[in-house]
Amino acid sequence: MTHRRDTVQMEQRWTNARLATMAGDDLGLIDDGVVAAKDGRIIYAGPAKDAPATQGAVHDCEGRLITPGLIDCHTHLIHGGNRANEWAMRLEGASYDEIARAGGGIVSTMRATRDASEAELVASALPRLDALIAEGVTTIEIKSGYGLSTNDELKMLRAARALANIRAIRVEPTFLGAHALPPEYQGDSDAYIDLVVGEMIPAVASLATAVDAFCEGIGFSPEQCARVLAAAKAHGLKVKLHAEQLSALHGSALAARHGALSADHLEHATDEDVRAMAEAGSVAVLLPGAYYFMRETRLPPVQAMRRHGTRIALATDNNPGTSPTSSLLLMLNMGATLFGLTVIEALRGVTVNAAAALGLSAEIGTIEVGKACDLAIWDVGDPAELVYRIGFNPLHQRIKDGQ
């Protein structure tokens, strides 16, 4: 098939590159590839021999690998304080459940977050965000969930949005009011869910793009989470769910019934849960950092996900208690080493499938015409190197919206 080589006014053009477009079912590799963009959108991605001529700026990539900009689709980046002391307790034998029931865990971060101003939350989050940006991340999801009051949850979401005005990154704010029970509602979780559903969700609807909940024995019941998801959808918000991290409550199947973008963690998900997610199109977001940091032993059912065709994404789960990491590249290696993902599965997990987990498949996640020109240019030629290496950042350049 021949292609007409029209002259197009292009703002930017990257040539002499090996492209991993992520289009199709694999890495979408194109040798001697070209990416061209205008007004922040990709207008050509393919072989150099078929590329239209241009009068715009041309950047010779000298054989480097270009992937879509990476996407961290599950983080708790905004928070006050840290929980290094609880980590020390865990090293001495305390369980996550014991720490939480003793007033630690999420509630201890709640206190520090409530005490912090919006400006302080932004300032403390910036180093964590910058570490992810330095690894080629161009889109990040940031959850609330450490305020646990209407005003403090709003403060967290405003802080998350503020980051996008300070750095060149797309931020997807998620409301996670049903993260833990605040002390003032101790013993009356239904009343707190009443607050989440009746007051918080209407208040945050203009700031958040999605709503999440923590479906666990130390969190909220499936019935309570169902109320949260239903209220979110009634306000036009996308939904997702923390599910099956510590126990099998079939939260992932619940998420699927509500048309959730994703269910996340999933170490205790059953075959039926995974099948329900596949049928609903919900993405399985795996979080190897939390698995590693908590010394978990039960693996998420990756083979069942493959068998049923459930899409798999990877994320840092950046948070102060169970995954204090700001390295998505490390998650690539952990996803492969701990969970048995292939190179293709891992890389698609931080690009095309991560975009699906945020409901942004039409915008980002692949290098295709019409999508945002979010790229990561790497000082490697083989995509496997991004998954293989540990403590090594080969990022050459990060491109956000063509710049």
From Swiss-Prot:
Main location: cytoplasm
Cofactor comment text: Binds 1 zinc or iron ion per subunit.
SUPFAM superfamilies: Composite domain of metallo-dependent hydrolases, Metallo-dependent hydrolases
Entry keyword set: Cytoplasm, Histidine metabolism, Hydrolase, Iron, Metal-binding, Zinc
Enzyme Commission code(s) on record: 3.5.2.7
Pfam families: Amidohydro_1
Binding site for N-formimidoyl-L-glutamate: Y146, N319, G321
GO biological process: L-histidine catabolic process to glutamate and formamide; L-histidine catabolic process to glutamate and formate
A molecular function GO annotation: iron ion binding
CDD domains named among the record's database cross-references: Imidazolone-5PH
Class of this enzyme: hydrolase
GO cellular component: cytoplasm
Subcellular location, record wording: Cytoplasm
Catalytic activity: 4-imidazolone-5-propanoate + H2O = N-formimidoyl-L-glutamate
Binding locations of Zn(2+): H74, H76, H242, D317
Highest taxon in the source lineage: Bacteria
Record's keyword annotation contains Iron: yes
Binding site for Fe(3+): H74, H76, H242, D317
NCBIfam families with a match to the protein in the record: hutI
Entry function: Catalyzes the hydrolytic cleavage of the carbon-nitrogen bond in imidazolone-5-propanoate to yield N-formimidoyl-L-glutamate. It is the third step in the universal histidine degradation pathway.
PANTHER family: IMIDAZOLONEPROPIONASE (PTHR42752), IMIDAZOLONEPROPIONASE-RELATED (PTHR42752:SF1)
Name the UniProt record assigns to this protein: Imidazolonepropionase
The species this protein was found in: Sphingopyxis alaskensis (strain DSM 13593 / LMG 18877 / RB2256) (Sphingomonas alaskensis)
Classification of source organism: Bacteria, Pseudomonadati, Pseudomonadota, Alphaproteobacteria, Sphingomonadales
Gene this protein is translated from: hutI
